Amino acid sequence: MSGSEFESLEKTLEKHIPDAELKEVKRILFGKETKKLALPACAVEAASARDFELQGYLFEASPEQLRPPRTVRVGLIQNHIVLPTDAPVLDQITALHKRIGDMVDVAAMCGVNIVCFQEAWSVKNEPVCLKTLLKCRFSAMPFAFCTREKEPWTEFAESAEEGYTTQFCQKLAKKYNLVVITPILEREEIHNVLWNTAVVISNSGSILGKTRKNHIPRVGDFNESTYYMEGNTGHRVFQTQFGKIAVNICYGRHHPLNWFMYGMNGAEIIFNPSATVGGLSEPMWSIEARNAAIANHCFTCGINRVGTEYFNNDFTSGDGRKAHKDLGHFYGSSYVAAPDGSRTPGLSRTRDGLMVTEMDLNLTRQISDKWNFKMTGRYEEYAEELTRATKHDFKPNIIRE
């Protein structure tokens, strides 16, 4: 069975492990059992009719005497490119927006308050550029940064404030009263520079702000620094009606200090919109966001795209392999992790999907009070050592005979 045919780890465990042992296996792998969330019949029927997976789970906190529950529902959306890559561009643009609109519609049926799309999901759809885009065979921004080609991929970059994708998401936010996190390829017009950016749109429909990818990969086929460099927005946290949220884009999940700084700035939920493939990172995927939730007393949400994307021209990986036309299989498997170490099952590795998760944000403080990682963190000592380690004349503290 190829990686692109293997649907999910959870379903394989359920298929092959006896029930008596399965519960313990899941407890060890995934933490305490996450309760299933009852979803409206209309949403379940709509997801089935629109051919995408719908899952719902619940993280509870202990009742408190002085604080009411702070219940929030988040929706994670993973999706393929909609039409074949040789379909007319305008048809693909229409199809993709309909697809995402249909999935957000179901999220709204489920009472979702915050929805997040996968990394670089957006399309370019401004009339002034349509003639140029007729050369391109993708509707969604494919993860084309493996190719090192500038054209036509840079044509997908757009303004974070005024671009069509932002306007499209503003309408969704206002229509459904939800916060939308929309990762795009941004063109900053003042300096004419590209960035990998996530725009955060308030449930009022206004733009709350944007944040840029802090860490840029130079590994395998991920040649992203050919297009954009490390972000310059720091570790912004956005105060929304539904809690304080942050966006740690893709490769940033490999850097513990990146998660740490979002947590230090007060994030209660950190989203990790990604585009990553099985041959490179899948063994790490189920671990990293969960570890970050534990270490930083917060909820984390990993979102990954699905499918295999093929390009017209061959490209190489710098590893001696023959030139090839695809990056590998994007394995989906989006999930949510809680500060107590528990996590939801992942969405499918092969299908479009919507993960709806209800969480009580009171759990973040309760777990912080229990484990005291921030109290016992000794940040001042580490700050001093890190400062020394960044100096050109740093000498490691190694004791020898």
PLM feature spans:
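Short beta-strand scaffold segments in enzyme catalytic cores
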Residues: 182-184, 196-200, 236, 302, ...
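Short beta->alpha transition motifs characteristic of CBS
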Residues: 129-130, 140-148, 199, 210-217, ...
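Active-site beta-strand/loop signature of hydrolases that rely on acidic residues for catalysis
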Residues: 74, 103-152, 173, 180-181, ...
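C-terminal beta-strand edge segments of enzyme domains
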Residues: 1-69, 304-401
